[in-house]
């Protein structure tokens, strides 16, 4: 049985950054990413996709406290995690992150890794109203899946709940084509709600059919490199939204700490969703 090391308490970003990096910690809070709301009648929201590589950083050290500190930097409303582990002990990564963020947890594990469940997860400030697991496994390939969670963002002033679909697609081109077709068919037949699809789509080919299909359905979103974290070249992590007008901006989070905490950078998107009418409003 593999034992997890004792974990340190959550540290601030300056304490947790790579000791070899002497650069200042960037001021990259969600508020600075998104700026002021553009118009009345809109509710702002920040959403992140983050492949945390089992909390093993670019220095090959298991340090979930660094992932927790990156999440503190981001201060997002919803975080989709990939390559996250969970187990019966609070020393496992997902339990550790949930304890430090205080967010609701939705797990979507696809296989067992060592003595832990392994796969996808959502951290959300909003209570989940409904959760469905989508099996995206292709025969002969690693098990894959997606979380479909409807969250009660009406608590933050939104006019309706929000559907969040979080995934991690396969490594083979044919596998990804099959998985994207499954996801798009699923979204097209689901109950209509504002929908965010996000995750590590593992798509290296910008001209490939999976990205073209996704852009055709959701409309194109910015191409932002997130991998590898030290010198990002590839936009493996993606965020789409329907309707597209809700999306304000997409950016990778490139703080010194994020560059060492995982082999992927977090991808952060800012949204403005229709706000609920105030009581007594005409």
What are these regions (language model features)?
Residues 1-78, 89, 99-100, 104-282:
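Active-site regions of metal-assisted phosphoester/phosphodiester hydrolases
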Residues 92:
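Short, surface-exposed acidic-centric catalytic microdomains
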Residues 95:
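Serine-esterase "nucleophile elbow" of acetyl-processing enzymes
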Residues 80-85:
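A short beta-strand-loop structural module common to alpha/beta enzyme folds
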